[in-house]
């Protein structure tokens, strides 16, 4: 058994109780759904409702969109999820991997090309 009071979880008694009760009350379908992190190709409320309520996803990998749209999707999904979701995005080049208006920074090869290991 994993000690969720220890690092990296560091849960208090109330947090441990929530985890145990939540797991106990989940259906098999909900537990399987927690393993799924689909790619979010759409901000359409119908699509979001479908992946959240029909598949019980454990998270979502966002594709690039405007930051306001991404924030709205994120808020909607978190508000309608029984369990907090993992959020994933392609961030290896900065915030522009989730939001088209996010900050971009050099990729690994660009940084290496500077010849400056402090970059």
Regions found by a protein language model. Name each.
Residues 1-54:
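Preference for extracellular/luminal or secreted protein segments
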Residues 41-119:
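Enzymes and membrane/adaptor proteins characterized by extended Gly/Ser/Thr/Asp/Glu-rich
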């Amino acid at each position: 058994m994993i000690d969720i009071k220890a690092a990296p979880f560091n849960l208090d008694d109330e947090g441990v109780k929530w985890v145990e009760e939540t797991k106990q009350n989940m259906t098999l379908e909900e537990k399987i759904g927690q393993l799924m992190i689909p790619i979010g190709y759409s901000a359409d409320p119908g699509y979001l409702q479908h992946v959240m309520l029909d598949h019980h996803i454990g998270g979502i990998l966002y594709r690039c969109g405007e930051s306001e749209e991404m924030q709205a999707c994120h808020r909607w999904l978190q508000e309608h999820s029984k369990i907090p979701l993992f959020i994933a995005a392609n961030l290896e080049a900065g915030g522009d991997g989730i939001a088209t208006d996010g900050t971009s920074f050099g990729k690994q090869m660009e940084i290496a090309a500077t010849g400056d290991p402090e970059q």
